[in-house]
Amino acid sequence: THPRAFGNFARLLGKYVRDEKVITLENAIYKLTGLPASNLKLKKRGYLKKGFYADIVVFNPKTINDFATFENPMQYATGVNHVLVNGTHVIDNGNHTGAYGGRFVKGPGYKN
């Protein structure tokens, strides 16, 4: 397993936004949300808008960190407080609720 499988977003937000200031928080969030949704033509995703699916991550920019390494890749990131997938609360105060709100999302290139 590659370490970024466990801490890719946290690495961007912790190391490159907060610590090294290589990218702004606003630009990083756009690159993690709106940009890929737009590029993949995913309807009603990637933005906080009325009528869009409620895919929301609440994190603390001061504490978000990744810990995964090549030697020990299966280390969860910290600083993510809440996650809602399609409006379903799946992470509550950093703990999985047991709920699964995800579903298969078809992009424009999907063929049966």
Predicted regions and their residues:
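Short, solvent-exposed cationic patches
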Residues: 105-112
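C-terminal cap of metal-dependent C-N hydrolases
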Residues: 58-103
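Short C-terminal domain-edge/linker segments immediately following a structured domain
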Residues: 21-26, 86-93, 112
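His/Asp/Glu-enriched, well-ordered alpha-helical/loop segment
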Residues: 1-63
